[in-house]
Amino acid sequence: MAIAIIGAGLGGLALARVLHVHGIDAVVYEREPSRGARGQGGMLDIHSGQRALREAGLLDRFHAVARGAGQDMRLLEPDGTLLLQEDTPDDAPLDRPEVDRADLRDLLLDSLPDGVVRWGRAFVSADDGLLHFADGGSATYDLLVGADGANSRVRTLLTDARPAHTGQNVIEVSISDIDRTHPDLAAMVGRGNYWVLGNGVSLAAQRNGDGRVRIGLSFYNTAEDWFAASGIPFDDPAAARARLIGLLPGWDPRFTALIAACDDAIVPRAITALPVGLTWPSTPGVTLLGDAAHLMPPVGQGANMALLDGALLGLALAAHPDDFAAAVHDYEDEMFARTGAAARMSADMQESLASPDAARNMLAFFRPD
C-alpha cells in the first residue's frame, strides 16, 4: 500500500525514516526544487524529540552534530540586570542540546534512500486516492500524511481550522561571523541563548553553528497589521535599524548594539497558531503531523512535537502494516493528548512572555525554588 507524505520538513522526514527502518516504503513530496533551495532557520532545542531520533536509529549521529554549549543561557532585564547565567560544563549530558535546523534536516535526508524525497512536487489537492500536483502530475496513495506546515493544504481534508494571529510580531535579524566582526557582542551573547525580557517586548539572541548570531525582537499584544503601522522601513536597512532601536526606549545600550550591528536582512514574521487542543474525527486514508496538525507559539515545543509525531506514526504503521485506519486511530489518540498539552504550555509561556513581569516569570520557571 502506498504512503504519501506531503512535506520534507522534520516531521515528514522522521516518519519516512522510521518507516524505512521497519522496511516500509513511503514517498515524500516536497514543493521546493532541492534541499538547499531555502534557508532552514536557526537553532533548535531538541529534548523530547530525541526519542524520535532514537527510534529512527539516528541518536548517535545527532549527538555528533548537536552543540552541548548551546544549552548555555543568560536572562536579563532591559536595564541590564542579569537575572540568570547558566554555563554548561563541557562534559554535561546532552539533555537539551541545540542543533542547526539545517543540520538536523540534512541528517534525516541523508538517512533515506535515493528517490524517497521527490523535489519540486507542489501538492494541490487529493481525491479518490489520487494526488494532484501543481505541475499537472499525479500519483496514487492509500495513506496521505500532511506534513506540509502551518498553511497545510492537506489539513483542509480534515478540518476547517486555520491558524490565527497570536498577538506576537517578530523582527528577525542576524549578525554574521560575529566572533570576527563584533567580538565584544559575541562575548556578551555567549555560546547559547541570550534573552532580554521587558514589558511586552523581548530580545532573543541565539548562537548558531555557522558563526552567526540570530536575533528575534518580539513585540507582544500587537495587532496582525502591526508591521504596517510600526514605521519600520523594511526596504531601507539602515533606517530600519534606527527605527527598531527607537522602539526600545530605556534599554541598555549593550542590547541595542546588537540591533545596530545586524546585517541588512531584516525580516518581519507574524506569529500564528492553531486552536489549542484541535482534533478531528479520524478519517481513513489521511492524517496530519507537525505544524499542519498543531501549530503553536515558538517556545521550544514545535520541532520536538513534529519529530515525535513522525516517529510515533511510523511505529503505529509498523504495528498495523495491513490496517492503516487502525494505525492512524492509535496515532491520533496519542498525538492529540500529547500535543494538546504542549500547545497549552506554549500558549501559557507566550502569555507569560507578554506580561509586564516577563523576566521574573521566566526566572521563576527556570529556578522555581
Where are these regions (language model features)?
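Short, surface-exposed charged micro-motifs
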Residues: M43, A204
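Short helix-loop capping/hinge motifs at secondary-structure junctions, enriched
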Residues: D60, D177-L185, E224, R254, ...
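Conserved mid-domain beta->alpha element of the FAD-binding
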Residues: I5-P33, V145-G146, I171, A242-L244, ...
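Short strand-connecting beta-turns/loops that link adjacent beta-strands
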Residues: P78-G80, D128, N208-G211, D322
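Conserved N-terminal helical subregion
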Residues: A2-I3, V18-H22, D45-I178, E224-W226, ...
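FAD/FMN-dependent oxidoreductases across multiple families
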Residues: A187, R191, G198-V201, R207-V213, ...
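C-terminal domain-closing interface element
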Residues: M349-D369
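A short acidic, helix-capping loop that chelates divalent metal ions and anchors anionic groups
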Residues: R35-G39, P93-L94, E224-F227, P298
